[in-house]
From Swiss-Prot:
Keywords: ATP-binding, DNA-binding, Isomerase, Magnesium, Metal-binding, Nucleotide-binding, Nucleus, Topoisomerase. This is DNA topoisomerase 2. One of its GO terms (cellular component) is nucleus. ATP binds at residues 65, 96, 124-126, 137-144, 354-356. GO terms for biological process: DNA topological change; resolution of meiotic recombination intermediates; sister chromatid segregation. It holds the Pfam family DNA_topoisoIV. The keyword Metal-binding applies.
Length: 1236
């Protein structure tokens, strides 16, 4: 490809189709928390919907056209209705009466006005900048975007006795000629737009609208009806009929936990709009619904801020009144009791983009009497719960403890705070600001001290922050008592808790300079410092811009090759990447500064030589309190989820403009703090396709790359992985991750990707009892290349870390590893808990999808499981599961426990049993448990544990399994999936199948290249053997020309693969072998062409299944060998077997697999009894052999009468089932019938 061919010029239509996000927002369906109308409850509910913003926007454009017509319909022609119809196929029709478009030809453009307005970009009637205009349209895109992003689009316009018809197809490229007819002038003017969105382009699998999007559009149309309540708005012929805005606001009222309803909403309506404050009896994250001229601003804007300012102002006034009486109102928590609705009519509104998600222009709010809202707030029933006594006493106690408020001498201060290096001058000299530099740890402190000049040390002190800073939002002084770092910082500055500061003049230092690493953790420390000061002393920051300042150091330095040897420092990756684009052919070496410890003392002196040049001043205003509250307040989880959902998960750079000398709180939060949040989530939340977190992926990549069969010490291996994969965090955390990836005890990994050689932990402490990394060894397990085939490697998308390609963004294993091993992680605003499932069950699920079953069908039948577990997992309520251990009840209160839920450690279980002994429930304990098996005999007090339910509960033998998933989607965005794991299966299935297609294509291409090389070699050899090439007398140039003349292929732009062969290569034997290689390669190509991607997948699944079955057999045998050969005999065992593996698909040989936990009985069952029927009085034999995880395979005909997809056909031991299900069944009554 030439450089010129890379550059293209697109038509406007093609540009919209290729880059729709620039015009209508993202066309990727994303989980979005929002208000939605619940028809069963008859009110709004807050739910997470799967929303396609692009699709929503193109529908919105047509709705807004109909709404804009209300303002155009004045005088005698009034608009009376807007009618919307959404068909089952997804075709949408919007019709309205009113003024309508004139059906005349434009003299300038030679076409009818409807054709211009709906079929040509950049046409509009809103270009006159009318200062009184209240329409939503501004840019001339609107309905044309809907036309372009639809498969068909038609318009009917009737005005002044004329009616026009026109339609478009092929994304507005093809248009029918306008058809204009005469009609009765008395007929009402009508505009009817009908269109079919291109659902495939928006990523909808069935090319039709989803149920979630129907509900979202229903809510959107309700908002329109509330905005324009004077006209009738109907959906599918059903009018909404809001008589007043108060009717609409009442839909947001949420009943309390006891069913009581909150007070009526506070609603104020004026000619330019309505504002409603809807009280709720329980707290929730701050929620605002904003609409401007009919446009729903999903990201808020100036009108939403103004409405919150009104509420803040009233609450502040209320708080002052309470303060006079020695009380304080927690205004932040009171705010969380309100949902705010802002519906405004504004002249010439301006939005942040064509998608109009945020209003940016100045707004005029309805003028409401301030004291009216204050009186309303005073009557709120929840207000008293947030009126507390002043924290003065606690603040005074803490001030005494830390010595705050006292003027301490430098000597006394240093003895109190040993880490503080105080400025040598006690007073500022008028020219220099007395500054306290706080650093991230001692190494950064050393850099600062070594770099400051003697003159600078007169007015600059240095204090290192050690340990984790706490979040002290909402003046949490009790929590502050536990944070020594912040206490010492406040003492160093001379700050007193509970005191209001308006100037830093009375403090020991007049500026706080934060000097941290330029990575995500450094951003977090900056955020916590800013949060603490804004929470405790907001006026100090608001009245003194730059009191908190940030010190910026380079994150990348490059040394340009050449005579100049120029060194260029970059303070952001954005500037570095911009330089790279501007100098594509430049040669340079780069040094990355992820921590301050990377800088030399000489470099540090450069930073401080022009100290003010590297400082950014933080500016804070009163409105920033709400934003910081959203980021740091524990109650604002939903806000943080929305914040993270909208952010790009793989944003690798801090996007702050370092050339500016000031930084606002919104800039810091949305451009730097978000970086920490994204990185924190990336570390904690797994990827949906490979189930790995970044550190796990780095380890796996390094181990796959190593190709070694010998085990290495974990401590040494971590060093290799850290260097090879550019891991920038402590090796201790990497070693811990390596250990966890190798653990294979029951409840650890179902598939351990690394081999544990040594003590890697056990069920005793769920792996926490592993030996030190310097004593244990590991290597890649046999599953490594089975799950991550080497043929995949060239097709993966690799990360660029410090100019070097390292691990891929994500792997695409043959199985969804997230389901095989599960995942637990807590990120920023998000957490994930996904249990593990049996790998062979997951393999069967993938086979079922290959056979045509949907992900939702398949996932419905998966049950959490840990390999080696000998108990039972049963379904509970609300998508929960319950893992139950295995135990046997004997006469005289004796119990034998042989299994516990795999999430519980043996030590924790032993501690629980000991507590029962202390309570005199358990009278005797005999513990024979090993590292990985449970074997405990108990004798309980007579009368205790009389029912099966009590046994499970009191002995902690049952544990709930919750599924609450959040994962990174294939595109790298955070996707909450809750308890529905079907997206994980579907995402993995789509990616893996696509990879097989690409792998097959690549392999065929490589084999064809090999074939061409072999054929060229044969052609040259034949000419040589026939004497047509005089090899001995030929020059290199002559041989090269001969190869060109013969039409031989080049390899790496040369013919060396032929010309540098040894002379023995031209013998008859070699020639015959060459011919055989050609025939073999041709046969392989033909065989590969006949092999489908699905067949390739099934072949690799068969290899994995066979290997894992052998691995599981060995593992279970090892567990059973550790168990006692005999224990207390006789008794009733519950449960005796696991629910069967539900039929999920056929294997390659047409057989269907089931997993059954078998149980044998001392008395032979009746000859006519079928498996699973009642057993009468037979009792299980403790000495009888039990097979755990046995795989029974039979032909499909053998199981044709079974319906394993149905939960009703699960195999159970009827005796245990009957005893467990007998209402109030007591062991005292039941045991005589079943025990001898």
């Amino acid at each position: 490809m030439t450089y010129a061919s890379k550059y293209k010029k697109l038509t406007p239509i093609d540009h919209v189709l290729l880059r729709p996000e620039m015009y209508v927002g993202s066309i990727e369906t994303q989980p979005t928390p929002m208000y939605i109308f619940d028809p069963e409850k008859g009110r709004m509910v807050w739910e997470t919907m799967r929303v396609n913003q692009g699709l929503l926007k193109i529908v919105d454009e047509i709705l807004l056209n109909a709404a804009d017509n209300i303002n155009n319909s004045k005088g005698s022609v009034r608009q009376t209705y807007i009618s919307i119809h959404i068909s089952d196929t997804g075709e949408i029709t919007v019709e309205n009466d009113g003024a309508g478009l004139p059906i005349v030809r434009s003299r300038e453009h030679k076409m009818y006005i409807p054709e211009m307005v709906f079929g040509h970009l950049l046409t509009s009637s809103n270009y006159n900048n009318d200062s009184t205009s209240t329409t939503a349209g501004r840019h001339g895109y609107g309905a044309k975007l809907t036309n372009i992003l639809s498969t068909k689009f038609s318009v009917v316009c009737r005005t002044d006795g004329r009616e026009s018809h026109m339609s478009w197809t092929d994304h507005m490229r093809m248009a029918t000629a306008p058809r204009v007819n005469r009609v009765d002038p008395k007929e009402k003017s009508v505009t009817r737009v009908k269109f079919m969105p291109d659902y495939a382009h928006f990523g909808f699998p069935n090319a039709s609208i989803s149920l979630d999007m129907k509900r979202v559009l229903h809510k959107r149309i309700m908002d329109l009806a509330a905005m324009f309540s004077k006209i009738e708005v109907r959906l599918n012929n059903v009018p909404f009929g809001f008589r007043t805005f108060t009717d609409y606001a009442r839909l947001y009222s949420l009943p309390g936990l006891d069913g009581s309803m909150p007070p009526e909403p506070f609603v104020y309506t004026s000619p330019n709009g309505s504002v409603a404050y809807v009280p709720q009896l329980t707290q929730s994250p701050k929620r605002i619904v904003g609409v401007v001229n009919g446009v729903v601003t999903y990201n808020g804007g100036t009108h939403c801020n103004a409405a919150m300012d009104i509420l803040d102002s009233c609450l502040d006034s209320l708080s002052k009144n309470f303060k006079k009486n020695g009380k304080v109102v927690d205004t932040n928590r009171v705010q969380r009791h309100f949902t705010v609705l802002v519906f405004l009519i504004q002249t010439q509104p301006k939005f942040d983009s064509q998608s109009k998600a945020r209003l940016v222009s100045t707004v005029t709010m309805p003028r409401m009497p301030k004291n009216t809202l204050e009186k309303y707030l005073e009557r709120m029933p929840f207000l008293e719960a947030h009126v507390n006594s002043m924290d003065d006493q606690l603040a005074n106690e803490l001030n005494k403890e830390i010595g705050a408020g006292r003027r301490l001498s430098s000597k006394t201060l240093i003895s109190a705070i040993t880490k503080l290096v105080d400025a040598t001058s006690s007073q500022p000299d008028g020219r220099n600001i007395r500054t306290l530099i706080i650093t991230e740890g001692d190494s950064a402190k050393a850099l600062a001290l070594n770099s400051l000049s003697s003159e600078q040390k007169k007015y600059c002190g240095v204090f290192p922050l050690r340990g984790k800073l706490l979040n002290v939002r909402n003046k949490n002084l009790k929590r502050l008592k536990t944070c020594k770092g912040l206490q010492d910082l406040f003492l160093s500055l001379g700050l007193e808790l509970g005191k209001e500061y308006r100037s830093p003049a009375e403090l020991r230092y007049q500026r706080l300079l934060v000097m941290t690493d330029q990575d995500a953790d450094g951003s977090h420390i900056k955020g916590l410092v800013i949060n603490a000061f804004e929470s405790l002393w907001p006026k100090l920051l608001q009245n003194n811009p730059g009191y908190i300042s940030l010190f910026s150091t380079p994150i990348v330095k490059i040394k340009v090759s050449g005579k100049s040897k120029e060194v260029i420092a970059f303070h952001s990756f954005r500037d570095f990447h911009r330089w790279q684009r501007a100098h594509p052919s430049a040669r340079y070496t780069a040094k990355y500064y992820k921590g301050l410890g990377t800088s030399t003392t000489a470099e540090g002196k450069e930073y401080f030589a022009d100290m003010e040049k590297n400082i950014m001043q933080l500016t804070v205003d009163a409105r920033d309190h709400q934003l910081l509250d959203s980021v740091f307040d524990a109650a604002e989880v939903e806000w943080r989820k929305e914040w993270m959902t909208k952010a790009n998960a793989f944003q690798g750079e801090v996007d702050i403009d370092r050339s500016k000398k000031t930084l606002t709180i919104p800039e810091f939060v949305h451009k730097e703090m978000v970086h920490f949040a994204l990185v924190g989530n990336a570390r904690a939340i797994p990827h949906c396709v490979d189930g790995l977190k970044p550190s796990q992926r780095k380890i796996l990549w390094a181990m796959l790359r190593r190709h070694n069969s010998e085990a290495s010490k974990v401590a040494q291996l971590s060093g290799y992985i850290s260097e090879a994969s550019a891991f920038h965090h402590g090796e201790a955390s990497l070693q811990e991750t390596i250990v966890k990836m190798a653990q294979n005890f029951t409840g650890g990994n179902n598939i351990n990707l690394l081999v544990p050689e040594g003590q890697f932990g056990s069920r005793q402490q769920l792996g926490n009892d592993h030996a030190a990394p310097r004593y244990i060894f590991t290597k890649l397990s046999r599953f490594g290349r089975l799950l991550f085939p080497e043929e995949d490697d060239p097709l993966l998308d690799y990360m660029d870390e410090e100019g070097t390609f390292v691990e891929p963004h994500h792997y695409v294993p043959i199985l969804p590893m997230l389901l095989c091993n599960g995942a637990v992680g807590i990120g920023f605003g998000f957490a994930t808990t996904i249990p593990s499932f049996h790998p062979l069950d997951v393999s069967a699920a993938v086979r079922a999808m290959i056979n045509g079953e949907s992900a939702k069908q398949v996932v419905r039948n998966l049950v959490p499981w840990a390999v080696g577990f000998q108990g039972t997992v049963r379904r509970g309520p609300d998508n929960e599961f319950i893992a139950v251990g295995k135990y046997t009840a004997h006469p005289n209160g004796r119990f034998h426990i042989s299994e516990i839920p795999w999430m519980t450690s043996i030590e924790a279980f032993r501690l629980h049993i000991s507590s029962l002994a202390s309570a005199d429930v358990v009278q005797r304990i005999a513990d024979y448990s090993g590292a990985n098996h449970i074997d405990i005999d108990l004798i309980v007090r007579d009368g205790s544990l009389t029912t099966w339910a009590e046994c499970e509960t009191d002995l902690a033998l049952a544990q709930r399994i919750y599924i609450n998933g959040t994962v990174f989607s294939p595109t790298g965005t955070l996707s909450p999936i809750d308890s529905d794991l079907s997206p994980v299966l579907q995402w993995h299935y789509d990616r893996r199948l696509d990879l097989y297609k690409r792998r097959r294509t690549r392999k065929i291409g490589l084999m064809k290249m090999d074939l061409a090389r072999l054929q060229s070699t044969r052609k040259f050899v034949e000419h040589f053997r026939q004497g047509q090439i005089d090899f001995l007398n030929a020059t290199d140039d002559t041989l090269h020309k001969t190869c060109v003349k013969l039409g031989l292929v080049r390899v790496d732009e040369s013919f060396d693969y032929i010309l540098k062969k040894p002379i023995t290569f031209f013998t008859r034997t070699s020639t015959e072998k060459l011919q055989a290689d050609i025939a073999k390669t041709q046969a392989q190509i033909e065989e590969l062409k006949r092999t489908t991607p699905v067949k390739m997948w099934l072949t690799e699944l068969d290899k994995f299944d066979k290997t894992f079955q052998e691995y599981e057999r060995v593992l279970i045998n090892s567990i059973q060998k550790e168990q006692r050969s005999s224990s207390i005999t006789g008794g009733v065992e519950l449960p005796a077997l696991r629910q069967p593996l539900l039929m999920l698909g056929a294997s390659a040989k047409g057989a269907t697999a089931y997993r059954v936990h078998a149980c044998q009985y001392e008395k032979p069952p009746p000859s006519k009894r079928r498996p699973g029927e009642s057993v009468g009085g037979a009792r299980p034999s403790d000495s009888a052999a039990r097979t755990v995880g046995k795989r029974l395979v039979g032909s499909r005909s053998e199981f044709k009468n079974k319906k394993p997809m149905s939960r009703k056909n699960n195999v159970k031991v009827s005796l245990s089932t009957r005893v467990a299900q007998x209402p109030g069944a007591q062991l005292g009554r039941l045991l005589p019938h079943v025990l001898m």
